[in-house]
């Protein structure tokens, strides 16, 4: 668990490092103002990323601005507009809706704000609008989970999926999960998706919807 937490902190630090490398080339300033926009801060993963970003900013003498849009893409876009208006040099961005991020990304590009996309990767058509991407191999993570389920439940299982269906990272994770089952059992039909619940990327919401589903 400690290693996983340190890896997430490193993700935030890497994002700040990438921002610094990009902005130095474009504008020789002693320090920069960096915006951080996750789609929620009710998830321990994103608070750990925030800790990593804050630590790296403190160590490099950069200023950090961040908001919690609370799983509201409209509010996230509005908060990013506010950060741009305040004069941020770069944005570390975890979009709520990876397929609907183009408007925000274009606004940043037009304003000269560098963007590092992390975790929930934008669609390939929008790659040219960002300056860097940091993400886990979510397909492989899902695959390994599916492989474990197949190997440890050889007779099959009823599966409850906790999803965030606007997040590409979750979509490919779930796809990888089912492939992991299919590739590692001869009776894949015995593994049934009995329900999909919306966790909204929130630990508390996920706990509540799973509790309700299991009753």
Where do the language-model regions lie?
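A residue-level marker of the well-folded mature domains of exported/periplasmic proteins
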Residues: 2-8, 14, 25-215
């Amino acid at each position: 668990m400690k290693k996983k937490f340190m890896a997430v902190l490193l993700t935030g630090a890497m994002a700040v490092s990438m921002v610094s490398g990009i902005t130095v080339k474009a504008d020789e300033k002693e320090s920069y103002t960096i915006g951080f926009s996750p789609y929620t801060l009710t998830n321990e993963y994103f608070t750990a990323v925030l800790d990593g970003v804050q630590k790296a900013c403190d160590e490099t003498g950069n200023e950090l601005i961040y908001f919690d849009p609370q799983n509201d893409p409209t509010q996230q876009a509005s908060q990013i507009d506010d950060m741009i208006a305040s004069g941020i040099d770069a944005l570390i961005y975890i979009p709520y809706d990876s397929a609907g991020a183009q408007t925000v990304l274009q606004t940043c590009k037009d304003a000269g704000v560098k963007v590092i996309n992390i975790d929930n990767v934008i669609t390939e058509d929008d790659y040219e609008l960002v300056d860097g991407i940091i993400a886990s191999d979510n397909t492989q993570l899902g695959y390994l989970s599916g492989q474990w389920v197949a190997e440890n439940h050889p007779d099959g299982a009823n599966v409850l999926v906790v999803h965030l269906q606007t997040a590409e990272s979750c979509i490919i994770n779930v796809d990888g999960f089912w492939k992991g089952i299919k590739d590692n059992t001869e009776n894949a039909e015995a593994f049934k998706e009995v329900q999909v619940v919306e966790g909204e990327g929130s630990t508390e919401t996920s706990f509540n919807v799973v509790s309700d589903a299991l009753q």
